[in-house]
Amino acid sequence: MQEIMKAIEESAIKIKHLIETGDTGKSEFENSTGDTQLKLDIASDKIIEDIFKNIPSIKAIVSEEQEAIVNLHENGKYLIAYDPLDGSSLVDVNLSVGSIFGIYENEFNAQNIVASVYVVFGPRVEMVVTTTDVKMYRLLDGKFTFIQNIKLNEKGKLNAPGSTQNCWAPFHKQLIDDIFNDGYRLRYSGGMVPDLHQILLKGGGLFSYPGTSDKPKGKLRQLFEVFPFALAYEKAGGQAVDGFKRVLEVQTTHIHDTTPCFFGSNSEINRVLEVYKKNV
């Protein structure tokens, strides 16, 4: 596992340089879900794949930017699903973006996730590693240095409501309105990584990306985005649910499956579960 962490650190330093100097324009290609790929997406993906190819403990990888699993080392122990540059469309307006890694054993599903890592590329570069606990590192003088352990409070103050609002179910809209009426502050940039990172560092709150009329199964991808952050939130003392159960109990049938998801401290997630139980 240690060599995987070092590989992610190496990729993060290279992607940092790419963000600072690379072309932010669109490519002529689409990814597996039909989104037009930015040149930064393709370049970031290649950086990570090229580094992972040299790690004997990695059996296979799959990128959000690619359709299929890439087999690497037959005797490897770990499978890695990753989003090379989540929120890449925010780079050209100079907002924070990130990379997300889910590390699995045996097969790609929630029950087999053993660790996760995400990297935030903002004014500073920070890396959060989740195994049995949640540790944050910061890039200082070219090296990642341990800063702190992360723990959530029982109740937070931030609300980050995602997806297209005119496609929300009425009860979901009422839930979000009620949370704001209770004094929560809006914190939503459109980047999953910095928004979830902020809630973790500020002690708690709610990030929601529900099923909607146009996307009943949600938009965020299980293996690449949802499960890695679910592990982080649970190990930090919070919860991650799909509205009814832990997202780490969700079954994956295809590597690019999506799911509705809610991440937060216990008070907010219990509120979500209560509302969804009554209305669905």
Swiss-Prot record:
GO CC, sorted alphabetically, is: cytosol
Q: What is its EC number?
A: 3.1.3.11
One matching Pfam family: FBPase
Is Hydrolase a UniProt keyword of this protein? yes
One GO MF term attached to the UniProt entry: fructose 1,6-bisphosphate 1-phosphatase activity
Which ranges does the record mark as transmembrane?
A: none
Enumerate the cofactors the protein uses: Mg(2+)
- Show the catalytic activity: beta-D-fructose 1,6-bisphosphate + H2O = beta-D-fructose 6-phosphate + phosphate
Q: In which pathway does it act?
A: Carbohydrate biosynthesis; gluconeogenesis
InterPro entries found in the cross-reference section: FBPase_C_dom, FBPase_class-1, FBPase_N, FBPtase, SBPase
Q: Which superkingdom is the protein from?
A: Bacteria
| Binding-site positions, Mg(2+) 2 | 83, 86, 225
Which amino acids does the record list as binding substrate?
Answer: 86-89, 188, 219
Note on how the cofactor is bound: Binds 2 magnesium ions per subunit.
The subcellular localization recorded is: Cytoplasm
Q: Which keywords belong to this entry? A: Carbohydrate metabolism, Cytoplasm, Hydrolase, Magnesium, Metal-binding
What biological process terms from GO does the record include?
fructose 1,6-bisphosphate metabolic process; fructose 6-phosphate metabolic process; fructose metabolic process; gluconeogenesis; sucrose biosynthetic process
Q: Give the binding site residues for Mg(2+) 1.
A: 64, 83, 85
Tell me the subunit arrangement.
Homotetramer.
Q: Which NCBIfam families would you find in this protein's record?
A: PRK09293.2-5 (NF006784)
| HAMAP family to which the protein is assigned, alphabetical | FBPase_class1 (MF_01855)
Family in the record = Belongs to the FBPase class 1 family.
Q: What is this protein called?
A: Fructose-1,6-bisphosphatase class 1
The gene from which this protein is expressed is: fbp
